[in-house]
Amino acid sequence: MKLKPIEVAEILQKEIANINCLSELEEVGQVITVGDGIAKIYGLANVKSGEVVEFKSGVKGLVLNLENDSVSAVIMGDDNQVQQGDNVKRIKEVLAVPVGKALLGRVVDVFGNPIDGKGDIASKEYRNIEVKAPGIIERASVSEPVQTGIKAIDSLIPIGRGQRELIIGDRQTGKTAIAVDTIINQKQAHLLTNEHDKIYCIYVAIGQKRSSVAQIVRKLEAAGAMGYTIVIAATASEAAALQFIAPYSACSMGEYFRDNGMHALIIYDDLSKHAVAYRQISLLLRRPPGREAYPGDIFFLHSRLLERAAKMSDAKGSGSLTALPIIETQAGDVSAYIPTNVISITDGQIFLESELFYKGIRPAVNVGISVSRVGSAAQIKAMKQVAGSVKLELAQFRELESFSQFESDLDPTTKAQIDHGKRLVEILKQAQYHPFPVEEQIVSIYVGTKKYLHDVPLQKVKEFEDKMLTEIRLNKNDILESIKNEKRITEETEQKLKTFLENFVKAFIKAS
């Protein structure tokens, strides 16, 4: 079959019309040197600090240093896949992570990719990991409580929604246990339909052992708390760059809840390892070291992260993001560089002491130097009614206790005060993974402060508390319900409680 010249011309015209002549302009550089997770790149003239670049192997890098003729990027992955001379492409993006309720119940890496083997995460929304913290006008004052379920904290060092409360102490003093207990304690609110009472939890493990993270996930699953929790893991075996990014990724996931009128709690476990990872990156980038070899912007590293926790104003949806950063001290030294930095950024600290822990006082909270700068604004009225004097009574007890070591003869008043203090300490003790509902905490503290334990032997105080709470749950549940619903102890409720306790104390002493 012969084609006429005019037909050939028509076919050629059609084909030419279908050709896509749009060419994409890519800015490409070249790796000059690579090592220790840092790549020095030549040729990316327009790249910005904090931008993501892509290496030939597909591994991504984060640009942190801009120099006269080159840029330095931290490699977010295996640096063995990046070779000298490799091309590096600018993708004109900053780091973003998936956010939303689809992540609840999952264990993810710093990029939001699932690492729990439960399939893909269907999240449609992405957020940048570095965003500006809410301004002054957008915020509201902290006025609603985050119930941790821990008597010593909810009564003496209350945490409010939108607060930043530091948990600080030596290793193995129960810092993570407090955080996990707080997550488990939110379960009751999630069984109800009222969205306002629900607090979604985010736990970010920075530089932890993989076995420790797995243990925490198993504990949360066993307690039925994983359904409202996201776990982000940047373990010790991962690159320092990933450990550095982890809290910012987690914070963006938490901000989704805050900005949509919901409430979230984020736990950074721990920021000491985060600071060490950033120090490693900074020294490899040849930034000048300062105190304890940390770079000069280490304060800004944590302040820009923790300032993102806030209680939003009504105009912004009244959501909140509460932060519980954890710091590990060396031999109880709270005056070291990172601890003092984070103490000055946060709205209070819960200080855990090894000495108390070894004495069997658990949670090992040192009430003397622990403080909540939000104070009783974050407590319900019923808790204020019973816990107002506890801190003072414990402080007086500590003073008298140290004084009594040198004095053999004590007058009856001092002896009674010491006995009362010992019983207060005993009633504030609590088993791990055993958070109490706030109404039961109030009854326990009421028993301690109103001196119902005077005739109960010290070693039987815990037994007394357990039996008393069991009895009140079974036969006097109306007292607990009244405290829970009214959020205060009415005269009628107090009268019922007094009658119940007087009868119960008599029966308990008689039985023992």
UniProtKB/Swiss-Prot annotation:
Subcellular location: Cell inner membrane
Stated name of the protein: ATP synthase subunit alpha
Signal peptide start and end residues: none
Gene3D superfamilies, per database record: 2.40.30.20, ATP synthase alpha/beta chain, C-terminal domain, P-loop containing nucleotide triphosphate hydrolases
PANTHER family registered for this protein in UniProt: ATP SYNTHASE SUBUNIT ALPHA, MITOCHONDRIAL
The keyword DNA-binding appears for this protein: no
Quaternary structure note: F-type ATPases have 2 components, CF(1) - the catalytic core - and CF(0) - the membrane proton channel. CF(1) has five subunits: alpha(3), beta(3), gamma(1), delta(1), epsilon(1). CF(0) has three main subunits: a(1), b(2) and c(9-12). The alpha and beta chains form an alternating ring which encloses part of the gamma chain. CF(1) is attached to CF(0) by a central stalk formed by the gamma and epsilon chains, while a peripheral stalk is formed by the delta and b chains.
Keyword Electron transport belongs to the record: no
Organism of provenance: Rickettsia canadensis (strain McKiel)
Annotated S-S bridges: none
Record field: catalytic activity: ATP + H2O + 4 H(+)(in) = ADP + phosphate + 5 H(+)(out)
Database matches in Pfam families: ATP-synt_ab, ATP-synt_ab_C, ATP-synt_ab_N
Site location (Required for activity): S370
GO cellular component: plasma membrane; proton-transporting ATP synthase complex
UniProt keyword annotations, A-Z: ATP synthesis, ATP-binding, Cell inner membrane, Cell membrane, CF(1), Hydrogen ion transport, Ion transport, Membrane, Nucleotide-binding, Translocase, Transport
Positions of ATP binding: G169, D170, R171, Q172, T173, G174, K175, T176
EC number from the UniProt entry: 7.1.2.2
